[in-house]
From Swiss-Prot:
InterPro entries: CYB561/CYBRD1-like (IPR043205), Cyt_b561/ferric_Rdtase_TM (IPR006593)
Protein name listed in UniProt: Lysosomal membrane ascorbate-dependent ferrireductase CYB561A3
Residues given in the record as L-ascorbate binding sites: K77, K81, R150
Signal peptide limits: none
EC class (word): translocase
Native organism: Danio rerio (Zebrafish)
Length: 247
């Protein structure tokens, strides 16, 4: 019972932090960066952080922990596979649109693409995520895939999932930091410099801290052996979350 209570407290924290990430990134870009548009202006760029944080981080993180929810244990796994794959697909769509937003902004302003460390890590993360989704779909959702193949692929699939989350966190916080260095320059646009810690810097830095906290909570859920979904034949195929203590 204690293991289950601990899970739901941690999972509630995961949900709260995820919502906070989305709210803060929208607040930052709406209140301090003038909102959103799709016209090649800076408002066009603002879609990039919002969609990447929402897609590659929050939706991705929640998709990763679906199988850990005890209420799903002992039931047909297919609906949860579909939910897992669906959240990841939505995450992929958000991420693609987010990448299109930044490429469109750069192209309109004749700015080079993929030159910074942030962009290198980010595009590698997106590529790995795409490969991970394709591997997961072909290995675990196609009924024709042999069980031996699924068993062979699963450890790599799980490991890659955690690594992609870590890379997403790195991409998000490096992107936030890069953006603040670009826009908070007293000598070029009259704003207070980043070093003076104006309100925008406080809001964006707070977003970065919450992103890290969200990622750590998701990794905690994924790494706790007590919260792993019991496999068939492990004497835990019966749905019993209220009595389950992780032993």
């Amino acid at each position: 019972m204690r293991g289950i209570v601990g899970f739901y407290i941690t999972y509630l924290l995961c949900l709260i932090l995820g919502i906070a990430c989305v709210v803060l990134v929208v607040h930052w870009n709406f209140m301090y960066r003038d909102g959103f548009a799709w016209d090649g202006s800076s408002k066009n760029f603002n879609w990039h952080p919002v969609l990447m944080v929402t897609g590659m981080l929050v939706l991705y993180g929640n998709a990763a922990v679906v199988y850990r929810i005890p209420l799903t244990w002992g039931h047909n796994k297919l609906p949860w596979k579909l939910l897992h794959a669906g959240l990841l697909l939505l995450s992929f769509i958000f991420s693609v649109i987010g990448l299109c937003a930044v490429f469109n902004f750069h192209n309109v302003h004749h700015t080079a693409n993929l030159y910074s460390l942030h962009s290198w890590v980010g595009i590698c993360t997106a590529a790995l995520f795409t490969a991970q989704w394709v591997m997961g779909f072909t290995s675990f959702l196609l009924p024709c895939t042999p069980m031996a193949v699924r068993a062979f692929v699963k450890p790599t699939h799980v490991w890659m999932g955690a690594m992609i989350l870590v890379l997403s966190i790195v991409s998000c916080i490096s992107g936030i930091n890069e953006k603040l260095f670009f826009v908070l320059k007293e000598t070029t646009n009259g704003t207070k410099p980043y070093s003076a810690l104006p309100p925008e810097a406080v809001a964006a830095n707070s977003l970065g801290v919450i992103i890290v906290a969200f990622g750590l909570v998701v990794l905690k859920i994924l790494s706790n052996q007590m919260w792993q979904r019991p496999e068939p034949g492990d004497d835990e195929g019966v749905y019993r979350p209220l009595a389950y203590d992780g032993s």
